Structures are given as C-alpha cells and as structure tokens.
Amino acid sequence: STEDGRWLFVGGVSAGKGAPLPVLSSDPIYAGVQDITSIAVARISALPEIQTVVLVAATRGLFRLKNNYSIEELPSSTNYSAALEGLSNVVNKFVGAGKKVVLVVDNPSFRDPKLCVKRKTIFDPLNSYIESQNRSDCSISIDRHMQLSQQYRKLLDEVQRLNPEMVSIFETVRHLCDVQSGLCLTHKNEKLLYSYSDHISDYAAEVIGEDLNEFLSTF
C-alpha cells in the first residue's frame, strides 16, 4: 500500500475449493475454481472504493498445464480459446463495474529453486556434476522464454485490445531476468527470485511491487 491507495488482496487457497483463478467459464477444465472465482469477482465488482483491479494468474493455471516448473507444453496447448473467453469474461465484469484492470505478466518457471542454490562438497568431481545439473535446469534465455510464452502473451494482448482504455499490461521480465545477458535465472543481485516452484520470493515481490505501485499511479 502507498499514501495514494491501499491494496486489498484476494487469493490464497480455500479449503476444498482451491484458489480463485481469473476465469469465468463453463468449460469443464475450469470447473473446480468457478464457485470461488464467481464469488470473488462479484464482491470486488460491488465495492465502489476499488478503482483498479490487478490480476495475477499463472500461465499453467490459465492453460491448465500439467506441471509448475516448465511451460514447455504451452505452445501445443489447445486451451487458448477457453482461456481467452474465461479471462475476458472476468475483465469485462470489472470494466462493466467501472474499474480499470491491470494484467501482470507471469514469471518464468523453474524447478524447485532450492535445488538451484550452489552447493560445495570436498569432492571436486561431485561439485562439477552438481554445477552442470544446476546450469541445465536453473536458467532460461529470454528469447526461449518469450518463444514458449507466446500463446500466453497473445492472450493478454487480445484481452487488453478489447478494452484498451481500461485494461493495461504490466511487464515483469526486466525484474526477473538480466536483460543485458539475455538470461532468466533463479537469483538476481545475489538474492533468490523464487521461494518454491514458480512462486516468486519476498525479495522479487518487493521489487516488482514498488514498480507496480509507480505504474498504477499513472494509469
């Protein structure tokens, strides 16, 4: 929160109902989250003091991918139309209630970040093996990430295009990747960017949040 406005967080996991996903759809792939999402959307829409809604949703959730450490299967996903309809329905509800909407771009996905922390033993051959394993699983080039996430980014662009004055996209790559080297890693400035699976760390959230607050002040 800032002097100009306060945040209201809606998320987490409800016992037996999962977490809200910004998708309103009759498609069976989203059946498990419809009740809790419908309640969240209705309550937020009814609160006049909420002027801007920031939507954060994992790519794997929108496209119903099978794992939380990679989006390699995204380019072949056939769920684009369902995701577009479902996300558009949520955004249209908020826009219809007079609220602006910001779509936060999802972060790169990695395996458990704890496995990417450098480890040293007294055996040099073992150290070399550990480092080789880390290098292969703990980084992805920005180009490759963009290539894999193309369908997801197309989805956000299309939703924003339908309501360009009320919907904006907030990019996170500059905070989670090294633009100069062209790499996305699990750490930056000697601090971890992820806490577990594809969830960003408190440090990353603070860095992104500061820039997001600045972005919201001009939107």
Kindly label every feature range from the protein language model.
Residues 1-219:
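Extracellular glycan-modifying ectodomains
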